Protein backbone atom coordinates (compact mmCIF):
# COMPACT_ATOMS: atom_id res chain seq x y z
CA UNK A 1 0.00 0.00 0.00
CA UNK A 2 1.39 3.44 -0.98
CA UNK A 3 2.03 5.62 2.11
CA UNK A 4 -0.12 8.78 2.39
CA UNK A 5 1.95 11.77 1.28
CA UNK A 6 0.48 14.11 3.91
CA UNK A 7 1.93 11.91 6.67
CA UNK A 8 5.52 11.91 5.42
CA UNK A 9 6.15 15.08 3.39
CA UNK A 10 7.99 17.56 5.72
CA UNK A 11 5.64 20.48 4.97
CA UNK A 12 2.39 18.53 4.60
CA UNK A 13 3.18 16.55 7.77
CA UNK A 14 3.01 19.75 9.87
CA UNK A 15 -0.33 20.73 8.28
CA UNK A 16 -1.64 17.18 8.67
CA UNK A 17 -0.89 16.91 12.39
CA UNK A 18 -2.21 20.44 13.02
CA UNK A 19 -5.47 20.42 11.03
CA UNK A 20 -6.28 16.93 9.70
CA UNK A 21 -5.18 14.03 11.92
CA UNK A 22 -5.01 16.14 15.09
CA UNK A 23 -6.57 14.10 17.95
CA UNK A 24 -9.37 16.30 19.31
CA UNK A 25 -11.66 15.70 22.33
CA UNK A 26 -15.02 14.58 20.93
CA UNK A 27 -17.06 16.73 23.34
CA UNK A 28 -15.64 20.22 22.68
CA UNK A 29 -18.43 22.74 22.14
CA UNK A 30 -18.84 25.74 19.82
CA UNK A 31 -16.87 27.76 22.41
CA UNK A 32 -13.74 26.14 20.97
CA UNK A 33 -14.49 27.66 17.54
CA UNK A 34 -13.08 31.07 18.41
CA UNK A 35 -9.43 30.05 17.94
CA UNK A 36 -10.00 29.25 14.28
CA UNK A 37 -12.19 32.37 13.90
CA UNK A 38 -9.27 34.45 15.20
CA UNK A 39 -7.06 32.88 12.52
CA UNK A 40 -9.66 33.86 9.90
CA UNK A 41 -9.84 37.41 11.31
CA UNK A 42 -6.04 37.71 11.11
CA UNK A 43 -5.98 36.55 7.47
CA UNK A 44 -8.85 38.91 6.57
CA UNK A 45 -7.19 41.88 8.31
CA UNK A 46 -3.82 41.28 6.63
CA UNK A 47 -5.47 40.84 3.20
CA UNK A 48 -7.64 43.98 3.42
CA UNK A 49 -4.87 45.95 5.13
CA UNK A 50 -2.38 45.11 2.39
CA UNK A 51 -4.68 46.52 -0.31
CA UNK A 52 -5.46 49.61 1.80
CA UNK A 53 -1.72 50.23 2.32
CA UNK A 54 -1.28 50.38 -1.47
CA UNK A 55 -3.46 53.51 -1.59
CA UNK A 56 -2.85 55.07 1.84
CA UNK A 57 -0.41 57.97 2.34
CA UNK A 58 1.25 58.28 5.76
CA UNK A 59 1.52 62.07 5.75
CA UNK A 60 -0.41 64.46 8.01
CA UNK A 61 -1.47 66.67 5.08
CA UNK A 62 -2.61 63.74 2.92
CA UNK A 63 -3.69 60.88 5.27
CA UNK A 64 -7.32 62.01 5.72
CA UNK A 65 -7.67 62.78 1.98
CA UNK A 66 -6.15 59.40 1.05
CA UNK A 67 -8.86 57.63 3.10
CA UNK A 68 -11.51 59.67 1.26
CA UNK A 69 -9.77 58.79 -2.03
CA UNK A 70 -9.84 55.06 -1.15
CA UNK A 71 -13.57 55.22 -0.37
CA UNK A 72 -14.53 57.29 -3.44
CA UNK A 73 -12.10 56.52 -6.26
CA UNK A 74 -10.61 53.04 -5.66
CA UNK A 75 -12.64 50.10 -7.01
CA UNK A 76 -14.46 48.63 -3.99
CA UNK A 77 -12.21 50.76 -1.75
CA UNK A 78 -15.18 51.63 0.49
CA UNK A 79 -15.74 47.91 1.06
CA UNK A 80 -12.07 47.24 1.84
CA UNK A 81 -12.01 50.10 4.34
CA UNK A 82 -15.27 49.03 6.02
CA UNK A 83 -14.24 45.36 6.18
CA UNK A 84 -10.89 46.34 7.72
CA UNK A 85 -12.39 48.74 10.30
CA UNK A 86 -15.22 46.39 11.32
CA UNK A 87 -12.93 43.35 11.03
CA UNK A 88 -10.97 44.80 13.97
CA UNK A 89 -14.18 44.80 16.05
CA UNK A 90 -14.85 41.16 15.14
CA UNK A 91 -11.22 40.32 15.98
CA UNK A 92 -11.73 41.68 19.50
CA UNK A 93 -15.17 40.05 19.90
CA UNK A 94 -13.56 36.70 19.04
CA UNK A 95 -10.52 37.19 21.30
CA UNK A 96 -12.69 38.23 24.27
CA UNK A 97 -14.89 35.14 23.78
CA UNK A 98 -11.72 33.04 23.42
CA UNK A 99 -10.29 34.40 26.69
CA UNK A 100 -13.68 34.01 28.40
CA UNK A 101 -13.83 30.36 27.33
CA UNK A 102 -10.26 29.88 28.63
CA UNK A 103 -11.23 31.34 32.01
CA UNK A 104 -14.49 29.36 32.23
CA UNK A 105 -13.09 25.95 31.30
CA UNK A 106 -9.66 26.30 32.96
CA UNK A 107 -7.65 26.33 29.72
CA UNK A 108 -5.14 28.63 31.47
CA UNK A 109 -3.64 25.56 33.16
CA UNK A 110 -1.77 24.99 29.88
CA UNK A 111 0.63 27.70 31.07
CA UNK A 112 2.77 28.25 27.95
CA UNK A 113 -0.23 28.37 25.60
CA UNK A 114 -2.08 30.75 27.94
CA UNK A 115 0.86 33.12 28.51
CA UNK A 116 1.57 33.39 24.78
CA UNK A 117 -2.15 34.08 24.27
CA UNK A 118 -1.98 37.00 26.73
CA UNK A 119 1.08 38.35 24.85
CA UNK A 120 -1.01 38.09 21.66
CA UNK A 121 -3.74 40.18 23.34
CA UNK A 122 -1.17 42.90 24.15
CA UNK A 123 0.10 42.84 20.54
CA UNK A 124 -3.47 43.04 19.19
CA UNK A 125 -4.30 46.02 21.40
CA UNK A 126 -1.11 47.80 20.27
CA UNK A 127 -1.92 47.09 16.61
CA UNK A 128 -5.50 48.38 17.00
CA UNK A 129 -4.33 51.53 18.78
CA UNK A 130 -1.73 52.54 16.15
CA UNK A 131 -4.22 51.63 13.39
CA UNK A 132 -6.86 53.94 14.88
CA UNK A 133 -4.45 56.87 14.48
CA UNK A 134 -3.92 56.36 10.72
CA UNK A 135 -7.13 57.99 9.31
CA UNK A 136 -5.91 61.23 10.98
CA UNK A 137 -9.36 62.37 12.06
CA UNK A 138 -10.05 64.31 15.25
CA UNK A 139 -10.38 61.22 17.45
CA UNK A 140 -7.29 59.65 15.82
CA UNK A 141 -5.15 62.69 16.62
CA UNK A 142 -6.44 63.35 20.14
CA UNK A 143 -6.52 59.64 21.02
CA UNK A 144 -2.85 59.38 20.00
CA UNK A 145 -1.98 62.54 21.97
CA UNK A 146 -3.74 61.46 25.17
CA UNK A 147 -2.63 57.81 25.21
CA UNK A 148 1.03 58.40 24.25
CA UNK A 149 1.17 61.27 26.76
CA UNK A 150 0.43 58.76 29.52
CA UNK A 151 3.98 57.44 29.12
CA UNK A 152 5.20 60.73 30.60
CA UNK A 153 4.05 59.27 33.94
CA UNK A 154 7.10 56.99 33.88
CA UNK A 155 9.55 58.30 36.51
CA UNK A 156 12.69 60.11 35.28
CA UNK A 157 12.53 58.97 31.61
CA UNK A 158 8.85 59.86 31.04
CA UNK A 159 9.09 63.10 29.05
CA UNK A 160 12.06 61.87 26.98
CA UNK A 161 10.17 58.64 26.22
CA UNK A 162 7.10 60.54 24.97
CA UNK A 163 9.18 62.82 22.73
CA UNK A 164 11.05 59.79 21.39
CA UNK A 165 7.75 58.09 20.44
CA UNK A 166 6.34 61.32 18.97
CA UNK A 167 9.53 62.03 17.01
CA UNK A 168 9.24 65.67 18.07
CA UNK A 169 7.51 67.91 20.61
CA UNK A 170 3.96 66.96 19.60
CA UNK A 171 2.02 64.32 17.65
CA UNK A 172 2.94 65.18 14.07
CA UNK A 173 4.15 63.78 10.75
CA UNK A 174 6.95 61.70 12.30
CA UNK A 175 4.43 60.10 14.70
CA UNK A 176 2.03 59.17 11.89
CA UNK A 177 4.84 57.66 9.78
CA UNK A 178 6.13 55.44 12.60
CA UNK A 179 2.60 54.42 13.63
CA UNK A 180 1.92 53.31 10.05
CA UNK A 181 5.18 51.31 10.12
CA UNK A 182 4.17 49.62 13.38
CA UNK A 183 0.65 48.95 12.11
CA UNK A 184 2.10 47.29 9.01
CA UNK A 185 4.65 45.06 10.78
CA UNK A 186 2.70 44.05 13.92
CA UNK A 187 0.18 41.71 12.17
CA UNK A 188 3.10 39.66 10.83
CA UNK A 189 4.59 39.48 14.34
CA UNK A 190 1.12 38.39 15.58
CA UNK A 191 1.11 35.65 12.89
CA UNK A 192 4.51 34.36 14.08
CA UNK A 193 3.47 34.41 17.76
CA UNK A 194 0.16 32.67 16.82
CA UNK A 195 2.16 29.80 15.29
CA UNK A 196 4.08 29.45 18.58
CA UNK A 197 0.70 29.55 20.40
CA UNK A 198 -0.50 26.66 18.18
CA UNK A 199 2.78 24.77 18.64
CA UNK A 200 2.37 24.76 22.43
CA UNK A 201 -1.35 23.95 22.17
CA UNK A 202 -0.60 20.86 20.08
CA UNK A 203 1.97 19.68 22.64
CA UNK A 204 -0.82 19.16 25.17
CA UNK A 205 -3.95 18.96 23.01
CA UNK A 206 -7.16 20.90 23.65
CA UNK A 207 -8.95 20.92 26.98
CA UNK A 208 -12.66 20.06 27.02
CA UNK A 209 -15.84 21.29 28.80
CA UNK A 210 -15.60 18.73 31.61
CA UNK A 211 -11.98 19.56 32.44
CA UNK A 212 -11.23 15.82 32.60
CA UNK A 213 -8.57 13.87 30.69
CA UNK A 214 -9.96 13.13 27.22
CA UNK A 215 -7.28 10.72 25.91
CA UNK A 216 -9.81 7.87 25.94
CA UNK A 217 -12.27 9.70 23.70
CA UNK A 218 -10.68 11.61 20.82
CA UNK A 219 -11.53 11.91 17.14
CA UNK A 220 -9.59 13.31 14.19
CA UNK A 221 -9.96 17.04 13.61
CA UNK A 222 -11.00 16.50 9.98
CA UNK A 223 -13.82 16.07 8.99
CA UNK A 224 -15.66 16.49 12.33
CA UNK A 225 -14.28 19.80 13.58
CA UNK A 226 -13.09 21.23 10.26
CA UNK A 227 -16.74 21.36 9.12
CA UNK A 228 -17.79 22.74 12.49
CA UNK A 229 -15.18 25.52 12.09
CA UNK A 230 -16.39 26.10 8.54
CA UNK A 231 -19.89 26.81 9.86
CA UNK A 232 -18.37 29.36 12.26
CA UNK A 233 -16.53 30.97 9.31
CA UNK A 234 -19.78 31.31 7.34
CA UNK A 235 -21.64 32.87 10.30
CA UNK A 236 -18.85 35.32 11.12
CA UNK A 237 -18.15 36.36 7.51
CA UNK A 238 -21.90 36.82 6.99
CA UNK A 239 -22.13 39.05 10.08
CA UNK A 240 -19.01 41.03 9.05
CA UNK A 241 -20.29 41.51 5.48
CA UNK A 242 -23.72 42.60 6.78
CA UNK A 243 -22.25 45.12 9.22
CA UNK A 244 -19.76 46.47 6.64
CA UNK A 245 -22.44 47.01 3.98
CA UNK A 246 -25.60 47.96 5.93
CA UNK A 247 -24.19 49.84 8.96
CA UNK A 248 -20.46 50.39 8.33
CA UNK A 249 -20.08 53.31 10.77
CA UNK A 250 -22.15 51.85 13.60
CA UNK A 251 -19.13 51.10 15.81
CA UNK A 252 -17.03 54.11 14.77
CA UNK A 253 -16.85 57.63 16.19
CA UNK A 254 -18.49 60.54 14.29
CA UNK A 255 -15.59 62.83 15.35
CA UNK A 256 -13.25 60.84 13.11
CA UNK A 257 -15.03 62.22 10.01
CA UNK A 258 -13.51 65.61 10.88
CA UNK A 259 -9.85 66.12 9.84
CA UNK A 260 -7.38 66.33 12.76
CA UNK A 261 -7.13 69.81 14.24
CA UNK A 262 -4.60 70.37 17.06
CA UNK A 263 -6.38 73.64 18.01
CA UNK A 264 -9.82 72.11 18.69
CA UNK A 265 -10.24 69.45 21.38
CA UNK A 266 -13.24 67.07 20.97
CA UNK A 267 -15.73 67.28 23.88
CA UNK A 268 -15.10 63.67 24.84
CA UNK A 269 -11.93 61.79 23.85
CA UNK A 270 -12.38 58.01 23.82
CA UNK A 271 -10.85 55.00 22.04
CA UNK A 272 -12.74 52.36 20.02
CA UNK A 273 -15.34 50.33 21.97
CA UNK A 274 -13.08 47.28 22.43
CA UNK A 275 -10.56 49.28 24.50
CA UNK A 276 -13.15 51.18 26.57
CA UNK A 277 -12.97 48.84 29.60
CA UNK A 278 -9.23 49.58 29.95
CA UNK A 279 -9.88 53.31 29.37
CA UNK A 280 -12.49 53.27 32.18
CA UNK A 281 -9.94 51.69 34.56
CA UNK A 282 -7.38 54.32 33.50
CA UNK A 283 -9.77 57.19 34.26
CA UNK A 284 -10.97 55.76 37.57
CA UNK A 285 -7.55 56.34 39.21
CA UNK A 286 -7.01 60.07 39.95
CA UNK A 287 -3.21 59.67 39.78
CA UNK A 288 -1.61 59.55 36.29
CA UNK A 289 1.04 56.88 37.07
CA UNK A 290 -1.51 54.88 39.10
CA UNK A 291 -3.92 54.89 36.15
CA UNK A 292 -1.24 53.69 33.71
CA UNK A 293 -0.18 50.88 36.09
CA UNK A 294 -3.85 49.89 36.61
CA UNK A 295 -4.41 49.57 32.84
CA UNK A 296 -1.29 47.44 32.35
CA UNK A 297 -2.21 45.28 35.36
CA UNK A 298 -5.81 44.85 34.10
CA UNK A 299 -4.37 42.71 31.27
CA UNK A 300 -1.31 41.37 33.10
CA UNK A 301 -3.59 39.93 35.79
CA UNK A 302 -4.39 37.20 33.23
CA UNK A 303 -0.79 35.95 33.62
CA UNK A 304 -1.65 35.18 37.27
CA UNK A 305 -4.50 32.79 36.42
CA UNK A 306 -2.43 29.55 36.39
CA UNK A 307 -0.85 30.58 39.73
CA UNK A 308 -4.03 31.61 41.59
CA UNK A 309 -6.05 28.54 40.50
CA UNK A 310 -6.53 26.78 43.85
CA UNK A 311 -9.49 24.52 43.00
CA UNK A 312 -9.03 20.76 42.55
CA UNK A 313 -11.54 21.00 39.68
CA UNK A 314 -10.41 22.49 36.39
CA UNK A 315 -13.63 23.66 34.73
CA UNK A 316 -16.30 25.95 36.21
CA UNK A 317 -18.90 23.49 34.90
CA UNK A 318 -18.92 21.75 38.31
CA UNK A 319 -18.23 24.88 40.44
CA UNK A 320 -21.53 26.77 40.96
CA UNK A 321 -20.17 29.45 43.34
CA UNK A 322 -17.14 30.30 41.15
CA UNK A 323 -19.41 30.22 38.08
CA UNK A 324 -21.59 32.96 39.63
CA UNK A 325 -18.55 35.19 40.14
CA UNK A 326 -17.30 34.47 36.61
CA UNK A 327 -20.53 35.93 35.23
CA UNK A 328 -20.19 38.81 37.71
CA UNK A 329 -16.75 39.49 36.15
CA UNK A 330 -18.29 39.49 32.65
CA UNK A 331 -21.06 41.89 33.78
CA UNK A 332 -18.46 44.08 35.51
CA UNK A 333 -16.34 44.27 32.32
CA UNK A 334 -19.47 45.22 30.35
CA UNK A 335 -20.17 48.02 32.88
CA UNK A 336 -16.55 49.24 32.52
CA UNK A 337 -16.99 49.29 28.71
CA UNK A 338 -20.14 51.40 29.11
CA UNK A 339 -18.47 53.77 31.63
CA UNK A 340 -15.47 54.26 29.31
CA UNK A 341 -17.79 55.79 26.72
CA UNK A 342 -19.45 58.20 29.18
CA UNK A 343 -18.30 61.75 30.07
CA UNK A 344 -16.13 62.26 33.18
CA UNK A 345 -18.85 63.35 35.64
CA UNK A 346 -20.90 61.86 38.46
CA UNK A 347 -22.35 59.23 38.75
CA UNK A 348 -20.08 57.74 36.04
CA UNK A 349 -16.86 58.49 37.97
CA UNK A 350 -18.12 56.62 41.08
CA UNK A 351 -19.51 53.68 39.08
CA UNK A 352 -16.18 53.42 37.19
CA UNK A 353 -14.17 53.37 40.44
CA UNK A 354 -16.40 50.70 42.01
CA UNK A 355 -16.31 48.55 38.83
CA UNK A 356 -12.50 48.91 38.58
CA UNK A 357 -12.10 47.86 42.21
CA UNK A 358 -14.41 44.86 41.71
CA UNK A 359 -12.49 43.83 38.55
CA UNK A 360 -9.23 43.42 40.48
CA UNK A 361 -10.99 42.05 43.58
CA UNK A 362 -12.56 39.17 41.60
CA UNK A 363 -9.23 38.24 39.99
CA UNK A 364 -6.83 38.66 42.91
CA UNK A 365 -8.97 37.71 45.92
CA UNK A 366 -12.19 35.90 44.98
CA UNK A 367 -10.85 33.39 42.41
CA UNK A 368 -8.22 31.81 44.75
CA UNK A 369 -10.41 31.98 47.89
CA UNK A 370 -13.47 30.49 46.14
CA UNK A 371 -11.31 27.60 44.89
CA UNK A 372 -10.24 26.81 48.47
CA UNK A 373 -13.82 27.20 49.76
CA UNK A 374 -15.22 24.81 47.14
CA UNK A 375 -12.49 22.24 47.87
CA UNK A 376 -13.56 22.35 51.52
CA UNK A 377 -17.28 22.10 50.72
CA UNK A 378 -16.73 19.20 48.30
CA UNK A 379 -14.27 17.54 50.72
CA UNK A 380 -11.61 17.08 47.99
UniProtKB/Swiss-Prot annotation:
GO molecular function: metal ion binding; ubiquinol-cytochrome-c reductase activity
Binding residues annotated for heme b b566, in chain numbering: 98, 197
Miscellaneous: Heme 1 (or BL or b562) is low-potential and absorbs at about 562 nm, and heme 2 (or BH or b566) is high-potential and absorbs at about 566 nm.
Keywords: Electron transport, Heme, Iron, Membrane, Metal-binding, Mitochondrion, Mitochondrion inner membrane, Respiratory chain, Transmembrane, Transmembrane helix, Transport, Ubiquinone
Membrane topology: Multi-pass membrane protein
Location of this chain's protein in the cell: Mitochondrion inner membrane
SUPFAM superfamilies given in the database record: a domain/subunit of cytochrome bc1 complex (Ubiquinol-cytochrome c reductase), Transmembrane di-heme cytochromes
Binding site for a ubiquinone: 202
Residues engaged in binding heme b b562: 84, 183
Example of a GO biological process term: mitochondrial electron transport, ubiquinol to cytochrome c
GO cellular component, one term: mitochondrial inner membrane
Cofactor, how bound (note): Binds 2 heme b groups non-covalently.
Name used for this protein in its record: Cytochrome b
Gene, per the UniProt record: mt-cyb
Co-factor(s): heme b
PANTHER family, per the entry: CYTOCHROME B
Function: Component of the ubiquinol-cytochrome c reductase complex (complex III or cytochrome b-c1 complex) that is part of the mitochondrial respiratory chain. The b-c1 complex mediates electron transfer from ubiquinol to cytochrome c. Contributes to the generation of a proton gradient across the mitochondrial membrane that is then used for ATP synthesis.
Residues spanning the membrane: 34-54, 78-99, 114-134, 179-199, 227-247, 289-309, 321-341, 348-368
Family named by the database record: Belongs to the cytochrome b family.
Subunit organization: The cytochrome bc1 complex contains 3 respiratory subunits (MT-CYB, CYC1 and UQCRFS1), 2 core proteins (UQCRC1 and UQCRC2) and probably 6 low-molecular weight proteins.
Organism this protein belongs to: Rana amurensis
Amino acid sequence: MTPTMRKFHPLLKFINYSFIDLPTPSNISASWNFGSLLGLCLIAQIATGLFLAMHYTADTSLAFSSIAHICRDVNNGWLLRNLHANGASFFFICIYFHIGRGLYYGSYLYKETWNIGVILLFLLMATAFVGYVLPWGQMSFWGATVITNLLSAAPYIGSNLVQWIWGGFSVDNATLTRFFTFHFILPFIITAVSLIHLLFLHQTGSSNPTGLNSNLDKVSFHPYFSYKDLLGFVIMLGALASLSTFAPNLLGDPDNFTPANPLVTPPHIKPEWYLLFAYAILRSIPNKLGGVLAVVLSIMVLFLMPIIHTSKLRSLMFRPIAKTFFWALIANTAILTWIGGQPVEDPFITIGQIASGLYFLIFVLLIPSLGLLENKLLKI
